[in-house]
């Protein structure tokens, strides 16, 4: 991973903080520490454009945006995992990870455990691949918006009933 990637990733952290209803000075301080550590303020970092910011602009609806945010948060959690033994930046990463945890998962430790469990699943393991394929039908069914489909059918039935009674 290049320093450009690191810089753009931390730029997203700053952007997320500005979009929040509150921002704490320690959060900015920790990002500054990470920027210094990764030398993320050099002129070559923006080369190639933003890492996440342009993608976030394309996702407007809140429910859709949650999908892309989950992928971005997953990236950061993996990123922090790589450097977990680095004492120079450990505190900074912990502060930022905790803030992401509060904002994205509403402080639910159960959700955090599930989220971390998912991002740690290795996709190159044959047994994991077999389990994933075995569960695919149920996962696909869970992804389909059943409640909206029922509401739509009810609305169509009511609308057809109104037209028939005229």
UniProtKB/Swiss-Prot annotation:
Gene3D superfamilies reported for this sequence: 1.20.1250.10
Q: Which GO CC annotations does the UniProt entry carry? A: extracellular space
Renumbered to this chain, the signal peptide range is 1-23
What Gene Ontology biological process does one annotation of this record name?
A: positive regulation of osteoclast differentiation
Spell out which residues are annotated as carrying Pyrrolidone carboxylic acid: 24
Subcellular location as annotated = Secreted
> Which InterPro entries does the protein's record reference?
4_helix_cytokine-like_core (IPR009079), Interferon_gamma (IPR002069)
Tell me how this protein assembles: Homodimer. Interacts with IFNGR1 (via extracellular domain); this interaction promotes IFNGR1 dimerization.
What is the role of this chain?
A: Type II interferon produced by immune cells such as T-cells and NK cells that plays crucial roles in antimicrobial, antiviral, and antitumor responses by activating effector immune cells and enhancing antigen presentation. Primarily signals through the JAK-STAT pathway after interaction with its receptor IFNGR1 to affect gene regulation. Upon IFNG binding, IFNGR1 intracellular domain opens out to allow association of downstream signaling components JAK2, JAK1 and STAT1, leading to STAT1 activation, nuclear translocation and transcription of IFNG-regulated genes.
Query: What name does UniProt use for this protein?
Result: Interferon gamma
Organism this protein belongs to: Sus scrofa (Pig)
């Amino acid at each position: 991973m290049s320093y450009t990637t690191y810089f753009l990733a931390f730029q997203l952290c700053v952007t997320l903080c500005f979009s929040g209803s509150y921002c704490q000075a320690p959060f900015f301080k920790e990002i500054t520490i990470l920027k210094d550590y990764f030398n993320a303020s050099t002129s070559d970092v923006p080369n190639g454009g933003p890492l996440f910011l342009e993608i976030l602009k394309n996702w407007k609806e809140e429910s859709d945006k949650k999908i892309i945010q989950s992928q971005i948060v997953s990236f950061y959690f993996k990123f922090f995992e790589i450097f977990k033994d680095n004492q120079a930046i450990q505190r900074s990463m912990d502060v930022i990870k905790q803030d992401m945890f509060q904002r994205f998962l509403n402080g639910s430790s159960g959700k955090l455990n599930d989220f971390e469990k998912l991002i740690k699943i290795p996709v190159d393991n044959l047994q994991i691949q077999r389990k994933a394929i075995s569960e695919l039908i149920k996962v696909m069914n869970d992804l389909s918006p059943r409640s909206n489909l029922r509401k739509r059918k009810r609305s169509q039935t009511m609308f057809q009933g109104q037209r028939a009674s005229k």
